[in-house]
Amino acid sequence: MNWSDLLQWEGNPLSQQAQVYEQQAQAVTNASEDLSDRANGLSGSGQTVTAAQQALRKNVEEMRKQAESLHSLATISGDAAKGADEIGKAARKFDQDAADKSIKIGADGSVDYVGKKAGSLIGGTQIMTNMAAVADTVSLIKFEADELVKDIQKNIAAVESGGKPQTSGGGVSRLDRMKLPPKGASPD
């Protein structure tokens, strides 16, 4: 996962796709209810009517499964949108915070000091502390992004195999607690 990619992550396209899936699920649900009503409305008796009703009910059941899958995909897309948006915002904010401390984060996530040379040992130690904090936070953001991708892939595979996706815990991410040490903080 490249840092430059994470800077571009946004949730809006995934959020829009979640809405499309939800609309499709509703359309399939409505169609299955209509078909169910028609199957129940068949009148007459005999093997032909019974066979037609059974075939229609089987189709209704398949349509309901399809609607459930579409609802699941909408949920997955919504969770992905939230995660991508959170990660993208955290990466962009942190990239700016690092730049404010004269630390450049490369496209691959590498960290370089681009400011003036330190005038003292304490200044040099502070620069090294800041660089270590930036490197750690870049690693954390990249880790969170990788975990999000793995979770989304796992959930899509679950839906494809007829199962249900894991719901996101909705817990507070570590991303919103990431900050560089304040100016003048001791290296300890």
PLM feature segments, named:
Residues 1-168, 174-180, 185:
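N-terminal secretion-targeting helices of virulence/extracellular proteins
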